[in-house]
């Protein structure tokens, strides 16, 4: 794991040294001294604008010309227009620096920032750089018996000197706790589905959350049936692995504080059931439980920081499989709410799981607000791609705060519409509700959201985050390698701490 240390004096042993330069390409007094020490290597680099122009995110790794010095490379980083820097952009710079250092095989890196950079103090700026680098250091190699040369190398340490190291370390320690929660979310999402059965997943939740003081209740199929959760059980009835409902109660606030409920879709693997998915890319359905992972990760982040709030998380863990006992298209199930649902398509299963879980959390905990997170529809990916997740809500203020929280951590949300016309599309001829709309291919993410909305009680603020397009990525980003992103943990943590 990457070690990040805030030190009181510059080390003479670091192989790489980070240098920040904005689009003005002007060197301050500290950089002038460093430039002279390295025979004007920095100024010569920035004079060649084809090599380095100071644009945001531009990074040039330049070999040092001093043979007797431990510093083998200068990592010259463009800040662009410093007036436009945000916390999210600075974090991304940290991730990009780590990636470039990894490619150049620079094992140890030094960074010295003792002045403000625009509105950011040196502790704030450096803690964000450190956070981005730490997030980008994540790897999932546990099932590889041999690693390629490019996979073997990892940056060992970053040493940072600021004008207030204790403050910088304090800021970074909080960000590190959040990043470790993101790592759990990525880990459990990347885990193969034959390993993370509902039982194993539930055990891992208990293992990580109980030591943090979170009350955990793992409910098996017998008790789920007694609760009347016919929709959730119907999804999992084709699997040999028993479905689970996991309830996580974090009581960080006072008894008088209201409870916020987080609900996550935990479809461990989704074949589509009898409405079979195409075989191409079906292996990616290991990520169909990413909504539940985001909920668990958020609880980890809150509990590890001892945030003074009351939050309950509920995740329904099921497998949507084929067998002689699998749910059939046309089946009717009775949900916990008493409403009946016609299952017109067994591949629209996530909303069935959520219908029972959101009802359960309202019945048991009487929350003021419910936020559900799910890789719910391919339609949201068609609409928004992998840039935004969809946000549906019955409360404008709630939606606005979630969107602001997402902007702050670069986990972006786009507000999607709710409308009576969409609600009418999910009326069933033989039951109270159908699990898909009656117009093929039309408004799929909107009708799915309305299905969940039918199970939200009057007076409860509700938001539905459809993360199907952002939960995993086929390409590495500044903060994450290819695979599970861990989307939602930082967004929800930010929302709960600062906007709730």
Curated annotation (Swiss-Prot):
PROSITE patterns: CYTOSOL_AP. Keywords: Aminopeptidase, Cytoplasm, Hydrolase, Manganese, Metal-binding, Protease. Its cofactor is Mn(2+). The keyword Nucleotide-binding does not apply. One of its GO terms (biological process) is proteolysis. The keyword Membrane does not apply. Mn(2+) 1 binds at residues 270, 347, 349. It comes from the Bacteria. The active site is at 277, 351. Binds 2 manganese ions per subunit. Its EC number is 3.4.11.1, 3.4.11.10. One of its GO terms (cellular component) is cytoplasm. Mn(2+) 2 binds at residues 265, 270, 288, 349. Pfam families: Peptidase_M17, Peptidase_M17_N. It catalyses: Release of an N-terminal amino acid, Xaa-|-Yaa-, in which Xaa is preferably Leu, but may be other amino acids including Pro although not Arg or Lys, and Yaa may be Pro. Amino acid amides and methyl esters are also readily hydrolyzed, but rates on arylamides are exceedingly low; Release of an N-terminal amino acid, preferentially leucine, but not glutamic or aspartic acids. It is an enzyme of class 3 (hydrolase). InterPro entries: Leucine_aapep/pepB, Macro_dom-like, Peptidase_M17_C, Peptidase_M17_leu_NH2_pept, Peptidase_M17_N. One of its GO terms (molecular function) is manganese ion binding. Presumably involved in the processing and regular turnover of intracellular proteins. Catalyzes the removal of unsubstituted N-terminal amino acids from various peptides. HAMAP family: Cytosol_peptidase_M17. Belongs to the peptidase M17 family. This is Cytosol aminopeptidase. It comes from Rickettsia prowazekii (strain Madrid E). The lineage of its organism: Bacteria, Pseudomonadati, Pseudomonadota, Alphaproteobacteria, Rickettsiales. The gene is pepA.
């Amino acid at each position: 794991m990457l070690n990040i240390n805030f030190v009181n004096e510059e080390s003479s042993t670091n192989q790489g040294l980070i240098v920040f330069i904005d689009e003005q390409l002007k060197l301050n007094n500290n950089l002038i001294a460093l430039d002279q020490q390295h025979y004007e290597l920095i100024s010569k680099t920035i004079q060649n604008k084809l090599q380095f122009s100071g644009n945001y995110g531009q990074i040039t790794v330049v070999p040092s010309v001093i043979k007797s010095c431990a510093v083998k490379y200068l990592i010259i980083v463009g800040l662009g227009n410093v007036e436009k820097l945000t916390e999210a952009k600075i974090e991304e710079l940290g991730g990009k620096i780590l990636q470039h250092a990894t490619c150049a095989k620079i094992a140890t890196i030094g960074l010295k920032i003792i002045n403000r950079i625009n509105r950011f103090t040196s502790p704030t700026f450096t803690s964000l750089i450190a956070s981005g680098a730490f997030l980008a250091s994540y790897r999932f190699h546990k099932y590889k018996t041999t690693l390629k040369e490019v996979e073997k190398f990892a940056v060992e340490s970053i040493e940072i000197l600021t004008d207030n190291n204790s403050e910088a370390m304090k800021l970074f320690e909080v960000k590190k706790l959040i990043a470790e929660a993101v790592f759990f979310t990525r880990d459990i999402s990347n885990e193969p589905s034959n390993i993370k059965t509902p039982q194993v997943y539930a055990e891992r939740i208990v293992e990580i959350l109980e030591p943090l003081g979170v009350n955990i209740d793992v409910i098996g199929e017998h008790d789920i049936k007694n609760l009347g959760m016919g929709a959730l059980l119907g999804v999992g009835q084709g699997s040999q692995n028993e479905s689970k409902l996991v309830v996580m109660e974090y009581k960080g606030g006072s008894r008088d504080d209201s409870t916020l409920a987080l609900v996550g879709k935990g479809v461990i693997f989704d074949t589509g059931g009898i409405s079979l998915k195409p075989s191409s890319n079906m292996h990616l359905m290991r990520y169909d439980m990413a909504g539940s992972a985001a909920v668990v990760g958020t609880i980890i982040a809150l509990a590890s920081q001892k945030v003074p709030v009351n939050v309950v998380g509920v995740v329904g863990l099921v497998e949507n499989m084929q067998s002689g006992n699998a749910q059939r298209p046309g089946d009717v199930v009775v949900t916990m709410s008493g409403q009946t649902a016609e299952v017109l398509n067994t591949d629209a299963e996530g909303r069935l799981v959520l219908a029972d879980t959101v009802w359960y959390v309202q019945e048991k905990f009487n929350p003021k607000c419910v936020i559900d997170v799910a890789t719910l529809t391919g339609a949201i990916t068609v609409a928004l791609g992998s840039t935004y997740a969809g946000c549906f809500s019955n409360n404008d203020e709630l939606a606005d705060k979630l969107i602001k929280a997402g902007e702050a951590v670069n986990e972006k949300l786009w507000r999607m519409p709710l409308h009576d016309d969409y609600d009418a599309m999910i009326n069933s001829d033989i039951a109270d509700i159908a699990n898909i709309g009656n117009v093929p291919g039309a408004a799929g993410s909107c009708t799915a959201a309305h299905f969940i909305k039918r199970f939200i009680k009057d007076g409860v603020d509700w938001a539905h985050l459809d993360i199907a397009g952002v939960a995993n990525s086929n390409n590495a980003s500044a903060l994450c390698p290819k695979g599970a992103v861990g989307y939602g943990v930082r967004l929800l943590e930010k929302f709960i701490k600062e906007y709730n």
